Amino acid sequence: MNRSRSATWVKLMAGTAVLSLSLAACGSDDSGESGGDTSPSASESDSSQETLTNDKCAGGTTSADTFKVGGILPLTGNLAFLGPPEIAGVGLAVSEINAAGGVDGADACYQMEDSGDSTDMSVSTASAGTLVSAKPSVVIGAASSSVSLNFVDTLTDAKITQVSPANTAVDLSGYDPFYFRTAPPDTIQGNALGTLITSDGYQRVAFIVFNDTYGTGLRNYTQETIEANGGEVVYGAKGDGDEFPAGQTTFSAEVTAALNAKPDAIVVLAFDESTPIIKELDAQGWDMSKTYFTDGNLSDYSDSFDPGLLEGAQGTLPGNDPDEGFKDRLISWYDTAEGETLKDFSYGAESYDAVILAALAAVKGGSTESTTVQQNYAAVSGATDGEECTTYADCVALLEDGKEIRYAGPSGIGPINKQNDPSSAFIGIYSYNSDNVPEISSVVEGAPAS
């Protein structure tokens, strides 16, 4: 599972667009199969003029007669702010698959279960067991790498295909033939973050990082790039033992130790712990414009801090910045399904593409069984150098003509490689404005070296 740690970079675009995120936890009692409305509801999408449906699975459906999408996504816990866009991506994909005629004659539906977070693994353990019994065609999730590592064996041992839209831990590269992801490994984001920091002229870097697979893995690859570019890590380096446990709430000692190392930039690698860390950094006089965040905490802090506190701080987020048409479709579906306005798009495109690729794999293989999805997943992503197509309907038409395809969806990822990772992916570079809201400033594309 060890991968080469270098990456090749191409600057693609620059501009400004507000990334609006919410830290509010999202829990829904009717997101799963039980107790949910099994009758689709619909609304008209202003952007696409299509009828959107909320296609939850009815009781008793399995992959034998339905393209059944299971989900283990954060409805609760310290990554719950990622739940709405990921669920919207799954739901929109299922809706559009059904609008295009389903999967090889079968209807599509989804069953959503809670992943919780790494502070209580019993939640994801129970959800994985529930979905094994439900016999889905594919399971989308989890958001957290640590959470996926907790239950991935439960799914793969049952020959159920798992696709994460947000896992970045390098430990998951090539983990199992039944595990895929549409998010890039930390080799890519770490290279982007380390390059950003040193390009900004900073050479002495401190990491305030939690002891989590995601945090330590991304720290390691960011540190490697910083050091390769002539910088040094003065606090929180790999092997120094400065990590704090997930769920910690006070950070006076960690911030004091980091500042005593006299860094000229600080990277915060945490989830919900980031808010008290920011407060402590500010209380001890740190210049917050020299602070860097990542996908786990690159959030809208407009309701958390005084205006201007984070202005100039920067961060990275895996994924392309989707076009407005796709965002409008996500917003419309979420309003249809949840009656709420979607404000966060993080990993929405990756979740959507994860489902579309799975459905296309089922079409190519002629079955909605999960083993068929696994056998054809990489091929429909372009691993067999097929003809490019950008919608489910267009890709199905090519498959029905006997052609190989390369689905190119809104996430912008390259074909799935032999490690079941994207062969290339985008990383967004963001900067905080005076309202403490991150705005996209540029996008880079990276690919792990072979």
Q: For the regions a protein language model found, what residue spans apply to each?
A:
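Bacterial lipoprotein signal-peptidase II cleavage site
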Residues: 26-41
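Extracytoplasmic "Venus flytrap"
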Residues: 51-91, 113-121, 144-146, 210-215, ...
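Extracellular/periplasmic periplasmic-binding protein-like sensory domains
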Residues: 281-355, 362-368, 445-448
